Amino acid sequence: MSEKKKFYITTPIYYPSAKLHIGNTYTTVASDALVRFKRLQGYDAFMLTGTDEHGQKIQRIAEDKGITPKAYVDEIVAGIKDLWKMMNISYDKFIRTTDEEHVKAVQKIVKKFYDNGDIYKSAYEGWYCTPCESFWTETQLVDGKCPDCGRPVEKTKEEAYFFKMSKYADRLIKYIEDHPDFIQPESRKNEMLNNFLKPGLQDLCISRSSFDWGIPITFDEKHVIYVWIDALSNYITALGYGSDNDELYNKFWPADLHLVGKDIIRFHTIYWPIMLMALDLPLPKQVFGHGWLLVDGGKMSKSKGNVVDPVVLINEFGTDPVRYYLLHEIPFGSDGLFNNEIFIKKINSDLANDLGNLVSRTAAMIEKYFDGSIQPPVDKEEIDNELIDMAISLPEKLDEDIKKLKIPEALDHIWDLIKRANKYIDETTPWVLAKDENKKARLGTVLYNLVESLRFVATTLTPFLPETGEKIKTQLNIELDTWESLSAFDGTRAGTKVSKGEVIFPRIDVDKKIEELNKLKEEQLKATRKMQPLKPEISIDDVDKLDLRVVKVLECEPVKKSKKLLKLKVELGGEERQVLSGISQFYKPEDLIGKKVVLVANLKPAKLMGQLSQGMILAVATDDDSKLYTLDIPEDIPTGSIVR
């Protein structure tokens, strides 16, 4: 017997600073669907997920709660595992970066970097974003904030170890160019090459000495290992790399697919490959950066408070409707919208009307006309061939779709068969055949073809919607559900008993359910909504230091290579100034030209994205940063006027 093909897929390991949201669920459900599909095809497949538990942010949250970091993450991790159980995630291993085996392996990895001369000790001085666990230079900041998440950064200076990233940059560029599928989609590959690698890599800070919640460096224990070095190593330490038990590593590495969100693809396609090169290990075969789930047009984020709780959706609608929406409605590789109304309408149209109706009608007719017993297909006609051919060709189409990570298209192909089977019922009119005793054999053949088509549907749908696939198999008493069995349209045994059972997907009153969800969301917001804490008290002398002036916007244009910055030329009492402002997500340049706004006029000039900014435009934002408004000034107030 030949050895099974191997398949190793990973999700990111999630940062347990709070409960996970539907965006995190998306990555994990997609990975689960892919690994289940490979198992169906007979692969020896392994799925890894887990949690990234170290770092300054976790330590601060735990301190605020008066508990240890480990106690805090233990509680969050339990919730994550419960969520994956609810979502029917079939992972093979859940790694925690606090696991002893991982800690020891990471220490060995860093020691090897040190022994090979890849890291050195120096001092770091710059800006640090605690939520992102990222370091930034002055020129990389946007309006003095983190360019990734837009939150405040802290000035930090401390002794640290650095990795010589530039040593491997040319080698990585060549590897990416020689392996066009290594980074996908194509747009992500181009971004990594043109925005990060080719302009030149800076050495990476890989340790911290200002806090202690992390893995200690064995040869300098006042340092803990920077969280990304710790986290990225999980993909090999989970398999036993660096331990005495490395059987899984030898079996499954290199990974076939790292599936990650586009916001962390830089770490997975630059830092991680360079780490592997330094360790003289093979690189993963592919890193795929999917898009974001957007709510009301904006990115979903725990910090913004606009997250969709998957537990609420599961409790209201069940697991498979949530999986279906995520897998089918989000273009894989692009951003997608999560919307309650679209979600419920898709349940009604695709799951209840198309699939649920087909199963119910088929089972009901077999019960009604043949006492629940499937008849042999002895009276075939030409009209049967299109349905049969579509079923037989389905596995090959799905195989091609999954190889290219076209998950929505794979579900489309399954639904093509579902819709064709529904049309087949209308074409063959079983209820008319049932009235003619001489047509009983033909009626039995039609119903056999429907059950056999549903065998193809149930078998291929199970990786994507596990509960639904199993329910169909149970109702129709499907016994043969292997990939090999899909090579022929004859896997249903005549004489098999079927039972109609419960409706798989009841229809939902859209307006009523949306109203219920909106009320539930408002209650949750009320429970969590808090005013931002006031800043420390200042004196009137501090207020007097601010020079707030009315200015008029003369010109405005986007800043190249920035998603947030606009460059404004403003007039201040006869003087012209250039100001950069991070408001491009809220204003088009043409909307600002001619407006009078408020400027902090005596702010020390600074360079942002390499361009001079002589002041700061004042604006007010909602708590979740989803909306922002400049302070508009009446036209009759002259520029240069003091705002008191």
From Swiss-Prot:
Motif residue range(s): 'HIGH' region: 14-24
The entry's Zn(2+)-binding residues are C129, C132, C146, C149
Q: Which residues form the tRNA-binding domain?
A: 542-644
Q: Name one GO molecular function term.
A: ATP binding
The GO cellular component terms are: cytoplasm
Keywords, comma-separated and alphabetical: Aminoacyl-tRNA synthetase, ATP-binding, Cytoplasm, Ligase, Metal-binding, Nucleotide-binding, Protein biosynthesis, RNA-binding, tRNA-binding, Zinc
Which EC numbers characterise this protein's activity in its record?
Answer: 6.1.1.10
Catalyses: tRNA(Met) + L-methionine + ATP = L-methionyl-tRNA(Met) + AMP + diphosphate
Q: Where is it located?
A: Cytoplasm
Residues annotated as binding ATP: K302
Q: Which cofactor does it need?
A: Zn(2+)
For this protein, the record's InterPro entries field holds: aa-tRNA-synth_I_CS, Anticodon_Met, Met-tRNA-synth_bsu_C, Met-tRNA_synth, Met-tRNA_synth_2, Methionyl/Leucyl_tRNA_Synth, MetRS_core, NA-bd_OB-fold
Chief location of this protein? cytoplasm
Q: Which GO terms describe its biological process?
A: methionyl-tRNA aminoacylation
How is the cofactor bound here?
Binds 1 zinc ion per subunit.
Q: Name one Pfam family in it.
A: tRNA_bind
Motif 'KMSKS' region covers: 299-303
Task: Provide the family line.
Answer: Belongs to the class-I aminoacyl-tRNA synthetase family. MetG type 2A subfamily.
Task: State the oligomer form and interacting partners.
Answer: Homodimer.
* Function of the molecule: Is required not only for elongation of protein synthesis but also for the initiation of all mRNA translation through initiator tRNA(fMet) aminoacylation.
Name this polypeptide is given: Methionine--tRNA ligase
Q: Which species expresses this protein natively?
A: Clostridium acetobutylicum (strain ATCC 824 / DSM 792 / JCM 1419 / IAM 19013 / LMG 5710 / NBRC 13948 / NRRL B-527 / VKM B-1787 / 2291 / W)
